[in-house]
């Protein structure tokens, strides 16, 4: 069985994104043109356009495209701003953010995901800085150094309001996560 990824991408945009209020035309355009499957390890490639959460071995997961792109859309217009992405996974959101901004810092805890992320950067799929910090270390820091970021995206849900992030963010920073 050989999967037609181009058709899968088109179906994702039509049936998942457009049908569920992803309306930002420049965001959709970038998504339509990016071969998301190239970010996935071979054993997960067939799930690149799935509308399900993909659970991995180390208690981490990949959000479904619709959820990821709702978060990106919630960031509003992205110019070449300084962006922090927490829980970067395989780089599925990073790759699209990078079409708008070249100033992206990322945090990921999973060694499996970090390896895939670094390989994708080596392959030229996107460009970002992977910070030497785990997600847990970031959230346990009472005074995270995040003043420089205009936008912060947390690819996951939080049990409580991220007070330390809010207190230490720049005045006009936009912060999005799943509640």
Predicted regions and their residues:
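Class I SAM-dependent transferase core
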Residues: 1-96, 100, 112-116
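Conserved nucleotide-cofactor-binding alpha/beta core module
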Residues: 76-179
């Amino acid at each position: 069985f050989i999967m037609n990824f181009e058709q899968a991408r088109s179906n994702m945009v039509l049936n998942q994104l457009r049908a569920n209020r992803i309306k930002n035309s420049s965001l959709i355009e970038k998504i339509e043109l990016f071969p998301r499957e190239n970010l996935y390890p071979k054993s997960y490639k067939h799930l690149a356009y799935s509308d399900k959460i993909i659970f991995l071995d180390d208690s981490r997961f990949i959000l479904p495209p619709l959820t990821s792109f709702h978060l990106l859309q919630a960031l509003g217009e992205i110019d070449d701003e300084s962006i922090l992405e927490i829980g970067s996974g395989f780089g599925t959101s990073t790759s699209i953010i990078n079409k708008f901004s070249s100033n992206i810092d990322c945090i990921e805890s999973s060694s499996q995901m970090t390896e895939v992320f670094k390989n994708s950067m080596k392959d030229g799929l996107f460009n970002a800085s992977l910070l030497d910090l785990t997600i847990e270390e970031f959230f346990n820091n009472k005074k995270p150094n995040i003043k420089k970021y205009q936008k912060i995206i947390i690819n996951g849900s939080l049990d409580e309001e991220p007070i330390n992030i809010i207190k230490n963010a720049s005045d006009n920073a936009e912060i999005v996560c799943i509640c």
